A protein has these predicted regions:
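C-terminal alpha-helix plus adjacent terminal tail
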Residues: 1-12, 21, 44-46, 162-168, ...
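Conserved CoA-thioester-binding segment of acyl-CoA-metabolizing enzymes
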Residues: 1-56, 91
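Beta-strand-connecting loop/turn residues
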Residues: 12-13, 58, 128, 228
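Terminal peptide-recognition signature
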Residues: 17, 35, 53, 65, ...
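A secondary-structure boundary/capping signal
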Residues: 20, 54-56, 62, 105, ...
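Glycine- (often His-adjacent) and acidic-residue-rich active-site loop
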Residues: 33-34, 55-92, 108, 218
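Crotonase-fold acyl-CoA enzyme core
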Residues: 92-202, 228, 235-236, 241-244, ...
Length: 257
């Protein structure tokens, strides 16, 4: 798909997806369709092992495009169709076979906050802030995403007040892996991405699948799935190469097989 609202670059097994819809990277229908198509593509690409999601401008993503939303005609099913597209965008990030690192350069609000919470790892610049301001425009949403990262009382506070929370607070709560100066955001995100890209791509993908699969399971059921994946991995060429490299005291050369 030709990209109008996104930029995609791939280098050394790392894909960088950049939101590029000025002025605030609001999620209109067009950019949602591009996000869905792009993450579906990255899911299948053998030359990609890690994805970095970031944005151009001072705002990471201001959330849904309210101006576009109020222009909906009221056609039966229209709102549900748009919401389904939104869900599929989120699922395409969560279910992408490659780890996704959010490099948040500014405000991430509403659906913009939600899409960062779909990522596997989050890094933010010092001036970034996060919030779910749907209540301020007479809407509601984001409950399930916040439940994955916040206590019930913290999630209720964010949802009921629409308050914005600075990056430093989310780092204190363990939601963010790092908060860095703006000039260091992409270098740090790329450093982390390259570190992960050096690992066995099969093992990394299995780890992500396991995390997603066991998140809401009992300890017994979750551990069984994890063990099954480990057995499957042990038969791979990458696992054999890693063992041989350990014996020979050299770095393994992974092929993703």
């Amino acid at each position: 798909m030709p990209l109008q609202y996104l930029k995609l670059e791939v280098q050394d097994y790392v894909a960088t997806v950049t939101l590029d819809r000025p002025p605030v990277n609001a999620l209109g229908r067009g950019i949602r369709e591009e996000l869905l198509a792009t993450f579906d593509e990255l899911h299948d690409r053998d030359d990609v092992r890690v994805v970095v999601l970031t944005a151009n401008g001072r705002t990471f993503c201001a959330g849904a495009d309210i101006k576009e939303r109020i222009k909906l005609t009221g056609r039966p099913g229209e709102y549900r169709e748009l919401n389904r597209l939104t869900r599929e965008v989120f699922h395409s990030v969560i279910q992408c076979s490659k780890p996704v690192i959010a490099a948040v350069n500014g405000a991430a609000l509403g659906a913009g906050f939600a899409i960062t919470l779909c990522c596997d790892l989050l890094i933010a610049s010092e001036h970034a802030e996060f919030g779910m301001p749907e209540v301020d425009v007479g809407l509601a949403g984001g409950v399930k995403f916040l439940q994955r990262f916040f206590t019930p009382s913290q999630a209720r506070m964010l949802l009921l007040t629409g308050r914005r929370v600075p990056a430093a607070e989310l780092y204190r709560l363990g939601v963010l892996q790092a908060v860095v100066p703006a000039s260091e955001l992409m270098p740090q995100a790329m450093k982390l991405a390259r570190e992960i890209a050096q690992k066995s791509p099969l093992a990394v993908q299995m780890l992500k699948v396991s995390f997603n699969a066991v998140e809401n399971l009992s300890l017994e059921d979750g551990y069984r799935i994890e063990q099954d994946k480990t057995i499957e991995l042990s038969k791979s060429e990458d696992a054999q190469e890693a063992g041989q490299a350990f014996v020979e005291k050299r770095k393994p050369v992974f092929k993703g097989r």
